[in-house]
């Protein structure tokens, strides 16, 4: 589908989220949809995407392997300025354990290995790791890492000692970082702006997609991030040049104010 979209000149593209699609089709369809104006000629390297934040079409440049956002391309364009300069945040999407591994809820002598299955929200809207135990050591055990286990919002958790393996699919893991780098990355990922950016690639219902990390820079490589972090003054809005009006829109986007690890 991406190759088809990028082959021809799509002059204007308007997307509908899963909830918008559901309403448009009398609550019978939930997959995100779109409509567009196409000219059958070679693409011009850009698309005019409808952006509901400024309520107008925004130019989005097409790049190989860079996804097309469903919305808020004005914000994504600001992210890509830093991502193109410093490189994207490298994440690993986890798979199911190999065949033959057994998983249980409570540990015993034969099942001593701790693993993260997923992350859920408690009644106070705070994230909690859901732990399971395996009879074999699973991937990422004994490896310091950031775990993003919530299937919609990630919610980064630092496993400093590498205490956990991962026993389920569709978790995201960041490895090969020093502890201070992980702390900095977690600080920037634990923001409403990042939750907002996650909305731009909800291609399958409301799941967190790996595609979105193509938009997000490696914060540990940016000097301004270190200056903010070292001075205990992380301002992700300032980092990306997000305006006062955009900031207000983002802060009002989520009715629920989530907590972080």
Predicted segments with their positions:
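Conserved Class I SAM-dependent methyltransferase catalytic core
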Residues: 1-22, 35-38, 185
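Alpha-helix boundary recognition
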Residues: 5-6, 190, 251
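C-terminal substrate-recognition regions of SAM-dependent nucleic acid methyltransferases
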Residues: 22-248
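Short, amphipathic C-terminal "tail helix"
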Residues: 245-261
